[in-house]
Amino acid sequence: MAAEGASDPAGLSEGSGRDGAVDGCRTVYLFDRRGKDSELGDRALQVSEHADYAGFRASVCQTIGISSEEKFVITTTSRKEITCNNFDHTVKDGVTLYLLQSVDQSLLTATKERIDFLPHYDTLVKSGMYEYYASEGQNPLPFALAELIDNSLSATSRNNGVRRIQIKLLFDETQGKPAVAVVDNGRGMTSKQLNNWAVYRLSKFTRQGDFESDHSGYVRPLPVPRSLNSDISYFGVGGKQAVFFVGQSARMISKPIDSKDVHELVLSKEDFEKKEKNKEAIYSGYIRNRKPADSAHITNDDERFLHNLIEEEKEKDSFTAVVITGVQPEHIQYLKNYLHLWTRQLTHIYHYYIHGPKGNEISTAKAIGPFNNIDIEISLFEKGKTPKIINLREIQDDMQTLYINTASDSFEFKAHVEGDGVVEGVIRYHPFLYDRETFPDDPCFPSKLKDEDDDDDCFISEKAARGKRPIFECFWNGRLIPYTSVGDFDWCAPPKKRGLVPIECFNRISGALFTNDKFQVSTNKLTFMDLELKLKDKNTLFTRILNGQEQRMKIDREFALWLKDCHEKHDKQIKFTLFKGIITRPDLPTKKQGPWATFSAIEWDGKIYKAGQLVKTIKTLPLCYGSIVRFFLHGDHDGEVYATGGEVQIAMEPQALYDEIKTVPIAKLDRTVAEKTIRKYVEDEMARLPDRLSVTWPEGDELLPNEVRPAGTPIGALRIEILNKKGEAMQKLPGTSHGGSKKLLVELKVILHTSSGNKEIISHISQHGGKWPYWFKKMENIQKLGNYTLKLQVVLNESNADTYAGRSLPSKVIKFSVKEGKPEKFSFGLLDSPFRVGVPFNIPLELQDEFGHTTQLLSDIEPVLEASGLSLHYEGITKGPNCVIQGVVAKGPVNSCQGKNFNLKVILPGLKEDSQILKIRLLPGPPHQLKVKPDSEVLVIENGTAFPFQVEVVDESDNITAQPKLIVHCKFLGAPNLPVYTVDCSSSGTSILTGSPIQVQNIKKDQKTLTARIEIPSCKDVSPVEKTIKLLPSSHAACLQIFSVEEQKAIQIKHQDEVTWVAGDVIRNLIFQMYDEGEREINITPSLAEKIKVNWTPEVNKEHLVQGLLPDVQVPTSVKDVRYCHVSFQDDHVCLESAFTVRPLPDDPKHLKCELKGGKTVQMGQELQGEIVVIIADQYGNQISSFSPDSLSTLSITGDGLDSSNLKITLEANSQSVSVQGIRFTPGPPGPKDLCFTWREFSDFLRVQLVSGPPTKLLLMDWPELKESIPVINGRQLENPLIVQLCDQWDNPALVPNVKICLIKASSLRLLPSNQQHKTDDKGRANLGVFTVCAPRGEHTVQVKGVYNKSTIEGPTIKLTILPDPEKPIRLNVKYDQDASFIAGDIFTDFMVSVISESGSVIKNINPTRISMKMWKLSSGMSRPPANAETFSCNKIKGNDKEDGCFYFREKTIPNKVGAYCIQFDFMIDKTNILSSQQVIVDVLPNQPMKLVPDSQPATPAVSNVRSIASRTLVKDLRLSITDNYGNHTGMDLVGTVVATIKGFNEEDTDTPLFIGKVRTLEFPFVKGSAEITTLVLAENSPGRDSTEYFIIFEPRLSTVSGTLESYSLPFMFYNDVKKQQQMAALTKEKDELSKSITMYRSLFDANKQLVDEMKCQAEEAKLKETQLRNELKAYNIDIPATQQTTHIEALLEKKITEQNELKKRPRRLCTLPNYTKRSGDILGKIAHLAQIEDDRAAMVISWHLASDMDCVVTLTTDAARAIYDETQGRQQVLPLDSIYRKTLPDWKRPLPHFRNGKLHFKPFGNPVFARDLLTFPDNIEHCETVFGMLLGDTIILDNLDAANHYRKEVVKITHCPTLLTRDGDRIRSNGKFGGLQNKAPPMDKLRGMVFGAPVPKQCVVLGKQIDLIQQYRTALYRLSSVNEDLDNQLQYLHTPDMKKKKQELDEQEKSLKRIEQKLGMTPVRRCNESLCHSPKIEVTECPIPTKRMRRESTRQNRRPKGDVPN
């Protein structure tokens, strides 16, 4: 075969060959196939490079030898005609062309086409990426076949119908050697495409340029579910590799659609080897082009099967067949023997291509569609056997089918990876059902575990379900990649700690991942390259798919909740019944405490266990016998439920022995034990119980009751026995034979009774030792005084309980007392300190026994006192309770006033501890003597000096002593006015006694004798000391004199003299002299010169002072300044001074000076008020009289803008000054003005202030341009306050206060607050405030006017453009399908309602409960909905609802009755205002024709077969119409007939009456929806049985109706007797009347019953609502009394509202930055208004930190931001949210950086917290989190800078530290920089209101919730009262006499009807009213509440015509 494919077939190329292109020419090969006699071979034609189509055609004609006039076409092998347009593009070197009569001509004989299939360079590039290999015990052969199926799937992807792929295993030896054929009905391949297929590694992406096929380049398919795009033939490798993996040779046969030719290519290993041997081109060959079903070239017997295969080509439009021969023997055996296995594997690989995106859901029938139209069929042909044919669609045990059909629920998700990478995923849950796992087993992964004896709960072993298999199988473009699986993701992996569900639930999930082609797979499609790595990348985004829509949510939380729901709903093992409630179990760990559902019974393994039932446990230590208390099941359950586990609470039995409750797993109940066995065990255990104690004292020291004992007396050892009632000793409680019983212990307690309570001082527990009894050792430690109790108590071993099962265990009590012993030691009591030398003191003693108890001294004892260095003696010692050593006196030296420490030893002979050391501090005694130094009696001093005396105060032991008020005085005698010296020796006892100098006046040369007396006035007992003083004259300075030396003559300047001198001159030659007390001149020494001071100069030349010279004096420049000159001398003895005054005189004229008398301001246009005074002054400004009247003419005045016309200049004679008046300026800018005054050579300048003139106009401050209209939203405030400024006529601000300002506006424009008069302030401004504007849409004007001095000042006109409010609803927009028809009883089309604002935009975020739909039947004059109009609520929003802010009314039932109905939609704006839509009028049309009915029910005829026509008349004037199921007339367009037939009650009865004319049927025409039955008469002497009921069946026969219409049946009575017929006719008439009356009665009673049921439902619902709200109020500690509820609620509500209003009125921090107008919903507002902060310090620092962003306006869209930008000319900052990169935004739940992996890395101080966590958002929380997350990032706030620095220093050790702020206002930037003004927040007042506001108090929010609840409760209470009142009224109405009478009448009429029917002989069938017969069945539950829709439909169907029921 291989040789044939490569050789020259049938001589087709005889005489031809390929020489290739020569010298730029192209070689073309031509086949002439115009007729049968054409040449078989091809012709080679050389085509010039520059040839055109005409020349080429001429060359063809010449080469073939045909006329150029002959008609023919030249085509490619793909039948593409060569024309002048495509010649250059198509005719290339080596191309094969056909000569045909027409393009679609059949190929009469086969041709060959030369091809090259040199492998693509990717062969080397990707050579290492491909090989088939076995994995995990799997044979790779199915995967090789899958490669061929991939190609077929791609080929059939464009099929509109069935995509058929056949794999034929041709193993019948009679037909040739084994072969495998893969055939599909795809689009086939052209010869060029077949050539491309042969090129190795030519993938679909590289088929460009030279490899370009007939089709365009690769186009990626559109996304489809599960990526089932059939785009899986990818790399140009798999098909060829698969072929040569299966066999040695491949034959490719293909026919493209719309092609006349079949293309065939053979590749074989043998042919390749032959070409290599012959040195031929290996990668070249021929494609055979032939007509379909032509197998003439198949001559090899080994390939006989090809004839049949080729024969099948006739029936195919397009196909491709891959025939593999030379199949490996091992492959043949595998394909034969393991057919089911590898077909199952193929089904697994292509599961979703075969069954569609949902997979093989066996329970769901599927129609052929785009996702399940693939048939893959496997055929096995063997010799002598019937062919086996398997369709993969029929295989039901592939793993995906098992996964899908054993799963109870699924969790769908989607992952987005690296842009376009999309992975769809599904997780399925396989529940545990009753006794086994339902997770399917995979033969490749056996996971069944051996049964193990589980000692725990009913949980199965952890890996029992899925085992070790990974969760996810992976599909690429919908096709399984078998060797790649993903174990799990972080969010679906079993948690390390127990979560919401048991851990085994994670092993009950399977899953599948479906990727698109953005993920790389190996070229053999066995493995993914990096799927798991990409999916587990941190940037991969997982979303959940709900209802086909992606939803962004936390995938881990959603999965955990889904898994919990699956576990609770689908896992079933134990049935829990008799639900009791939900509890928490505080005895368990916190995470497991609740919720727990409690039940009273379970059903398990066919048995029922109930509360109270006796049970026994197994596998517990010990075994438990007891009664069931209840069952626990973890979770929030309600009602009966199945679960896999649970616990049972058991009360141990007998309870007298085991007063204990145990909880064990349900699995540990013994299901085999009999109940009588448990009861016998309980009875046996009740016998043995302890009764009393036996106490003995084996070692003596017995304790007697009520004994009094000295402290320390021992209590002897105790021996105790526990005796039962039989007197038997026992050591333990009786226990079961199956477990350890509880030991008994004896507890001994000694209790001391004190005033503060009982105190347990001894507590011992003794246990029985087996060989020795209960024993307590001797007790010798009872030493405290008081009353005692010794108690012996039997207790339990573990719990130490003294009761068991409610009974006290035996005990024994002995009471006794303890008193003090004899004295053994002593201590000192509280001493009265201080201790002083020679002063007696007492020493109190406290005597104690050996245990420290206080006792008394009874015997005579002489104390001994000893102390080193002291002499001691005492008076005596007292006995009795208070022992004191009295009158102790100590004497001796103590060295200092602070005293000295001594150890005083006290000895009491005769005591056990007879001595104690008392540490005392002995202080000096009281003053006794005064010592004065110097010791000399006569002392000599100089006058004016002080004398110091050294004084000491000593006690009797010569110790210097001190005491309070110890003051020593020294008085001098012998002269007047002598000082007195005092010194305080209170602290030290010694000091220097001195004082003021002794100064005696007029002591010149003689000395003076004085006496000094020194004494202590406070101590009269201390003798005074006297000294004699001799006083000499002083040698210190006593006099200072000043002289002025002029011309060698010194003139004395006396003290306080005045000296006149020329202003500004200097006084020189001043000298001074000093004299002492003896009038002796003192020589000035440098030391004395240092002490001389002058006041007119700070620096004095010391050398001049030594010479007696004083500094020069500078005379003041102003004659008004008088200078005071002072000279002083001061030393330690004296202070001398001498002073004089210098008065200046004026100098010569020098300057001209001007002075303004009056105000400096000049009002524009007015003269200067006041005058200007001009004077002449000297150089220092002193005025000089120089002016004269003649000299005034030379005075000139100039200035900028000065108006000199009114100047007045006058001379003031008295002051010698010039007065200037009449200063005025020309109008100009206000400001300072300079005036220049000039006289002779002198000039001066004067500045005045030019101010604005009188007010004449008004201007607006800080207001936009008035040329443009200002936009403002209706009902909103203006952006800026209205501030008015008064101005003069030249537009200068006029500072005039109290000018009245008012606004002039149109009446249609309303300003709030209302128009009030305002007055200007001191600056001429008036702030009218910020107005709220309400006006119609459009432009309005407002004018400002003022009143000044009774004249009007016109102000500017403000133009306002009123914009609609985007948040104010004005109308409802209703959308629905207006072309829809409304059929009675059907479902309305969907209504989509949106609330439209004034601006025309849709208002979003509206509570759906505020939207309602009302419907009522339209009647004349009714425009408003009636009270009984039906009301509907809107439906929940679905996932695919695109429009936000829209409300949907879906599936609302159309009324049953036809007519015009009105639909109106209402929006509740608030409690009083409702906005209604335009009414929608709908015409309800009748439904489908269903039955034939009469217009009015005729009476039951009674006829006979007599001659009289009246007696034979059945019907007279009967009109029959077609109606639908609801009684609406329909079928007006129907045409046909109504056939009347008489039938008997028995179908077999043939003796039925006949119509007139002896016919059985009559036909009546049916037109325009009805048939008129004018007269229907029986035939005379008609057959029929007497007194028999017959029926006339009126059957409609209408040609245009599909289906059968219900016929109308009219009963009638037939009689043979005329008289009887007349009687029966009367009875029939009466029967009809009774039937009608009964029907109306029943309708009445049924309607009343339904009304009562509905009222009961409403009452119960109202009661439940009231109870629910009452409980919610209790949570807020609000109790509602049982009586006077309404009064209490109203008072409580008023109180809460008052409290809330008071809280809201409290002042709190506000942001005063003006917000931006929210003219649309896309504007959120300025950042400063979006958040609030409670803490003032945090608000200050965060506001400062964001200061540059606070006035930025945040918008949702860039368009809205751009609009604001344009409106404000770019002045306003804007921030659109749709431009924020959200991946870098912080996670608001992220912990602070000092937490690492959930652990505290270091302990911070300063209360760190993320700044963003301090923000609260009143609105738009999600958007605000985005904004502030971007602005603040991870900024942290702490208390102070120290805390912040410490925090940063620690954080940077582990991670990056964000910006830190402190509550003190400091900032540390993220780079660590802090300090400076730019990092320090200013005070709050400096932020100018640009600060975040404070939220309302939390209590205000709580009050708001309480008020809302109270209002709801008030409404619910009113509702409950109203409903109960209506129900009571209705029940009373049902028991009224009138209703009882009607009930009685109904009973009587039914009895009468029954009698009449019996008389008539009619079948007693109750024919109820038609509407009642078809009323829906309503399920009866515990609460008789039908569903809302059922009630509505039932109410409609039971409507009856108005009118009274006949009485």
Curated annotation (Swiss-Prot):
Residues 1721-1848 form the SMC hinge domain. The modification N-acetylalanine is found at A2. Residues 111-702 are annotated as: ATPase activity domain. There is a cross-link at K1375 (Glycyl lysine isopeptide (Lys-Gly) (interchain with G-Cter in SUMO2)). Residues 1984-2007 are annotated as: Disordered. One of its GO terms (cellular component) is chromosome, telomeric region. It catalyses: ATP + H2O = ADP + phosphate + H(+). Non-canonical member of the structural maintenance of chromosomes (SMC) protein family that plays a key role in epigenetic silencing by regulating chromatin architecture. Promotes heterochromatin formation in both autosomes and chromosome X, probably by mediating the merge of chromatin compartments. Plays a key role in chromosome X inactivation in females by promoting the spreading of heterochromatin. Homodimer; homodimerizes via its SMC hinge domain. Interacts with LRIF1. This is Structural maintenance of chromosomes flexible hinge domain-containing protein 1. It comes from Mus musculus (Mouse). The gene is Smchd1.
